[in-house]
Amino acid sequence: GHVSCGKDGRACDYHADCCNCCLGGICKPSTSWIGCSTNVFLTR
């Protein structure tokens, strides 16, 4: 499933205004790559 994130708690998807999902389900702000192990973003 999706990972809740962001100030509004929306589900993590490709939405840049929400967040980027990195491999492993790690969710980070769309403006930060810190903590991401890969540049391949997942939708689920």
From Swiss-Prot:
Modified residues (D-leucine): L42
Keyword tags: D-amino acid, Disulfide bond, Ion channel impairing toxin, Neurotoxin, Secreted, Toxin, Voltage-gated sodium channel impairing toxin
Residue ranges annotated as propeptide in the record: 44
InterPro entries: Conotoxin-I_CS (IPR013141), Toxin_19 (IPR012624)
Any GO molecular function: toxin activity
Short name of any one Pfam family annotated for the protein: Toxin_19
GO cellular component, one term: extracellular region
Tissue specificity annotation: Expressed by the venom duct.
UniProt xrefs under PROSITE patterns: I_CONOTOXIN
Record's function text: Iota-conotoxins bind to voltage-gated sodium channels (Nav) and act as agonists by shifting the voltage-dependence of activation to more hyperpolarized levels. Produces general excitatory symptoms.
UniProt family annotation: Belongs to the conotoxin I1 superfamily.
Protein name per its UniProtKB record: Iota-conotoxin-like Fi11.1
Source organism of the structure: Conus figulinus (Fig cone)
